């Protein structure tokens, strides 16, 4: 077809294990790429088909081939919360800190969805905890922005720098305050987040916060 989808890629993305078995037995090309450079492994990883991922890895499928937007099987497994697949890919040498076109890593994507198990797996395999994706967003900022308190706690336990600012000067604390995530604000304050920092628009977390309960937690900072 125009998209160059092989029978193996289609079977892998649809989760048809018995067809994958038959095709592999007939020496199907494991790493054949579709027109967007995705492979059977990529599709199985994205769609959460763990058994197929394991079969493809046993047939030496390439774990670090770059597909559309410079993403890899590890990216899409992390992004979609497939913990067992992330584990299997890392065990087969998936590169943990590859970046996609947006400067994102598997870690920043896992933090964005608040999957603490995957965050911890990636960190255990040496992921850079303070990596900044496009616009300066770190895993901690993304977790705080989306109210993923358990992920925030995990990142801090694993050495994330609390007060890093993105390109707009906004910290994890400011993002949590802006989006009404009181629990995340509490955790960040308990760990000593700097309340005096200002964004590029000259505002502190207290000034950014809309929720009165959050405003109360944050000391007003005089100039």
Regions found by a protein language model. Give the residues of each.
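Ankyrin repeat A-helix N-terminal signature
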Residues: 10-16, 43-49, 76-82, 109-115, ...
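Ankyrin repeat start-site detector
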Residues: 2-3, 35-36, 68-69, 101-102, ...
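Ankyrin repeat structural motif
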Residues: 16-24, 49-57, 82-90, 115-123, ...
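Ankyrin repeat (ANK) core detector
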Residues: 6-9, 39-42, 72-75, 105-108, ...
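Leucine-rich solenoid repeat scaffolds
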Residues: 186-223
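Intrinsically disordered, low-complexity polyampholyte segments enriched for Lys and acidic residues
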Residues: 2-4, 22, 26, 55, ...
